[in-house]
């Protein structure tokens, strides 16, 4: 890179005609490539564009690192000045990408670094009860669909407290979102001590797996 700094601005075109930078390649799925952080640091030092989006899509390297749960790469990107709240990801901001794809480690990292939590479903998925309460009490009130989607996301994140809050606001215990063929009980079923309590609570309130609902 020292001998050929112009490589930092290289764009690679895929079969669909979309172009991506070497920073995107370093952050691409599944992430966690050997020396990923060091490679990104080297590219930034050589002048790589932090905010350059994939041509035609607008996703920045931080969006891709978020979707891959690659905290090592994200740390270098954020330290270099990457926009924590860049729009136009496959789901939205880097944080929204992380939450939507269930990448909890990097979601927490982004919140800790100051990413905005300005969506009901993001607060629910991350178990941010006080932030969720603000959304639930502000005007205009969230719609039924927004309540249901946030409830599903709370279960996605294994967050029993925010799930209960949304259930008390009328969430459908068996809501099936358009973007995932799983009920709240299905998506909550990756067991750990926190999720086990959530799964038990869902069952106590009549939640069913999708196989039962299809019968």
Which role does the model predict for each range below?
Residues 1-22, 126-146, 150, 162:
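N-terminal segments that cap or nucleate solenoid repeat domains
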